[in-house]
Amino acid sequence: MSASCLRLLTLSLFILGQCNVTAAQNGVDDEVTTVTAILDSATTAAADNSTVPTQSASNNNTSQSSKIPTIFGMRVELPADDPFGYDKHGVCSVTPEEEFKVVIYGNHLDKIHQIIWTFTNNCSEPAYVIDALNHFKVHFNHKATFHLTLKLLPEMVHAYKMCVKPKVAPGSPPLGEIYPLDDISTWLTTERPPKEYFLPLPLQIACIGFLLCLSALFSGLTLGLMSLTPQELELVIKSGAIKEQKCAAKILPVRKKGNLLLCSLLLGNVIVNSAISILMGELTTGIYALIGSTMGIVIFGEILPQSICVKKGLEVGAHTISITQLFIFLTFPIAWPVSKLLDCLLGDEYQAYDRKRLMELIKMSITDNGQVSNELKIAVGAMEIADKVVKDVMTKIEDVFMLPDTTVLNAKTVMEIVKMGYTRIPVYQYGDKNNVTDMLFVKDLALLDPDDNFTVKTVCGYHKHPVKFVMNDTPLPNLLEAFKKGEGHLAMVKRLINTDDKHDPSYVLVGVVTLEDIVEEILQAEINDEFDIVSDNVNKVKIKKEQNRDATKYFGDHEAPQTMISMQLQMVALQWLVSNERGFRQEFLDTNVLERLIRSSARRVDVSALMAMGDDAINVPRLAKVYTKDELSDKYILILEGRIQVTIGASGMMFEAGPWHHFGGEIMAKLVDGAATLGRSMSIVGTSELSARRPDLMFKPDYSAVVKEDCTYLEISVSAYINAYKASLMQRERPLNDLSDVSHNSSAHNSNLSLVEKPGPITDPSAMLVPENVRKPSVVSMDSPKILVGLGQHPVAPVAEEEEMALLDQP
């Protein structure tokens, strides 16, 4: 072969790369890995191997010399799972007792007779002999392959060396002695070279463990921190435990930069995982490296840390916030531009919960937290009313107790009304229940004499309680706002039945709705008291308890309630009030009405039945407190029996007030001065509602009054006085013909009137018509005349004292 061809072949082999690992090509099996050994110099190889035998080329003719086989290089192909290397001298190392493939390159390889492997310098001492006839495969005269299996080299032996024995043509002289090739690239050894690592083995193992910890940290923080939204962290800071607040405060500044934090954590996680794979591949190869790195990263770097950070993300994030900030700083040049791009594309990550989502979130929390389930139900109820309308909570009209305006309020009728247990009763005209015109409050009947036979129309005409109407599709929040503004706490519900544009709209009453119905929807529970007949207006679930509404003791003429004061004491109290307070005289209150007011306003406090009271006013039982310093009050107090202790001034001076001492004269003065404003238009619903509307009729005492011993006294509230005043007006202004007509027709009318029409409940029952026998007590006792006059005490008239003594002397 020409020198140019030789150089071309040598250059081609050099391009393959000296001792590089490549896949087998040109028919070589895919499972093998190629090791290429190239001669250091093609020219040197040609010179060294141009003549394999020891005879000189001058002893042969030119034709014979050109046919001598020449070896340029050798390549060893091993299985992929069989690693190989080179020892410190550059000799290729193979695994002993395992077959491998050898590829040799050169010229005139078809002229090779045998290839001999020896571990000495003498080719006549072969260790292995490869016969070209049986084991040799030549490709185009410049490439040949064969398979070889080597035993472990003996000790003190360095390598197997190759000897090439050429073929001898017939008639040619025999070859002389052959020697091993001196090129170490054609040598083989079975000694395994020591494995080289990037770092010392112990340090590399420690680095892998450290990187696994970082991988676990980044993976856990990516899930743990990113699952904590800034809103949740702010919520924890404001309402969480002290430890949680501290953790959230550390995380929040970093978490607000969400995309920057995400990019830094992901970038750090990728870098660490890549480093783990590289270092793990240095420790082992093949399937073992794959399994080791995968198991380490997946189990210790992903599954375990993420499962922990899902539940403990707040604590883990707070304790590792320094490491997180460090990696944000290290990855800032790359992470910051990416995070800004994400901010522009995706926008802010703040997400506000709408009402429905928040409501469903609370509902899910109810089943998980039994301790606060009631509070959560109330919250859900308050949010759900926005989706409800009046017809969802109203009491149907067929279950409403109503009265015609012609009903005569005699004793029997009043007792039946009280037995029904309703405090606000719709009143209709002309026998048409759709024509509700007024509202009768049972409290308006408290001071009426049943023998006067007033009609419902007359009573309603004086009080004129407004009647509120709402549509059945009115949202509950709108109705609640109306109730909050003081527009009553009960409304009649109507429904539009005529939708024709050509005619005026017409309506029909379909029910009644009260503030209690809305409160029940908010509380998600029924509110029952002693006057409820059903516990659910919609489903009509009846209450099984038996009601006791005996009203005869309040309206009977022969038997007074046990808590009422004696007749003699009533007469003396009436005379004292008329003599000493202008507001109780005939020009304001009728005598019969005043008598009923005294009977209904009598209170008795039995101190022996109360708890032992200390000197501290805070420990005084509620029933024993009459007045509290600097607290608004609407009560006028007159002591009949017993004593009340009064504490006055900044020094806490205490005095005792005895019988016929009174308190609250300021209220009576205001009522007398404002009698003209207590007309028909004022609707007296109750003490609390009146106080909210007319604070000008209240006073603020600069003293405290407490009952310290058994005491009987009159407690007349502003609302009770105004009711008595209106009752007196009705008796004075009632036309005579109305009295005669009512007296003439009362028996017939009552026989035909059925007050109880199987009524269902109106959902706002209130207290009994007459106050309880034992109510809030009062207290005072004084010896200083100046103090008594200052508190409004008046001496009892001598005539009153004589009459009282005379009455007491009677059997």
UniProtKB/Swiss-Prot annotation:
Protein name (Swiss-Prot/TrEMBL): Metal transporter cnnm-1
PROSITE patterns registered for this protein in UniProt: CBS, CNNM
Record has Transport as a keyword: yes
Pfam annotation, one family: CNNM
Membrane topology type: Multi-pass membrane protein
GO molecular function annotations of the record: transmembrane transporter activity
Lineage, top ranks: Eukaryota, Metazoa, Ecdysozoa, Nematoda, Chromadorea
Keywords (A to Z) from UniProt: CBS domain, Cell membrane, Glycoprotein, Ion transport, Membrane, Repeat, Signal, Transmembrane, Transmembrane helix, Transport
UniProt gene name: cnnm-1
Main location: membrane
Function: Probable metal transporter. Probably acts redundantly with the other metal transport proteins cnnm-2, cnnm-3, cnnm-4 and cnnm-5 to regulate Mg(2+) homeostasis. Promotes postembryonic gonad development by regulating Mg(2+) levels, probably via AMPK signaling.
Subcellular location: Basolateral cell membrane
Phenotypic consequence of gene deletion: No visible phenotype. Double knockout with cnnm-3 results in increased levels of intestinal Mg(2+) and reduced levels in other tissues. This Mg(2+) deficiency in tissues leads to a reduced lifespan, 100% sterility, and smaller animals that exhibit a developmental delay with defective gonad development and which therefore do not produce oocytes or form vulva. In addition, the gonad development defect in the cnnm-1 and cnnm-3 double knockout is rescued when the AMPK alpha subunit aak-2 is also knocked out.
UniProt key word Cell inner membrane: no
Organism, as annotated: Caenorhabditis elegans
Domain of life: Eukaryota
